[in-house]
Structures are given as structure tokens and as C-alpha cells.
Amino acid sequence: MRNYLPIFIIPVLASCTTMQPAKSVEVSEVITADLARADGSWAGVASISQRSDGVLLSLTAEAPAAGTYGMHLHALGKCEAPDFTSAGPHWNPNMKQHGRDNPMGAHDGDLPNVEAAADRKVTLEYKLAEFMLSGPSGLLDADG
């Protein structure tokens, strides 16, 4: 069964075979938001930052239960309980198809799933190298 968190969360999928010097990354803007469940209880904290190498999404959360959760960025800057449908459809400025593995290309808002272990804790970072917070097709627009 696939579960959905009413938040945007993103895991880092990276492997490293050799150590290389860290590159300097400039951070120009950081936005942080508390995450809440449908009943209003605290679920975690998410942040999104504009960096010189793209956008970084970070999350520290407590899932409702252990398991796999789908992650998505939504089109509207509104996320009201109890069903969170106010967030609108998945963010899709390039008009692609739904599904991370869609052969026609996935929505920009379709993100990798995340696993919550038995302790329900989720801590992740995910870099979106081709994204910007503002500007044409930016994540932030008039509705946030």
C-alpha cells in the first residue's frame, strides 16, 4: 500500500566512489515551514534553499507509521487540512506525464519515494539541480 505525506519531501540518492574536495556553494535564499498532519499535530520541518548549484529540499519529519511514502511538489502554495487538496495538482511546468518512471518523462513534482523505519523518523536532503525558487517556471510564484 502506498502512503502519502501531505508535505513535500525528498531523499538524497547518491553514491561516492572517491573523495573529492568540497565545492563552494553559495546559498541565496532559505524558506522553512513547519509540517502538520490533518489533525494539526506537528509532523516535522521542511526547508527549501536556493543555491548556486540548484535548489536543495531538506526534511526532518515523523511519519504516521513505518513504510514507504510518496513525495510530490504541488502547484499551489496552499496546504489546508484535513485533506490537503488545496495544494492542487503536482507541480508540472513542463507539462510531462504522471509517474516517476513514466517513459514520457515525469512531472517535475514527482519525486522519489521515502522509507520511514520502525521509529517513523525521516531525515533527508534532495538536490534539484535544474530548478530555481523564482523566475520563469520557478517553484515560487504569486500563490507561494
Explain the meaning of each model-derived region.
Residues C16-G144:
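N-terminal leader/targeting pre-sequences
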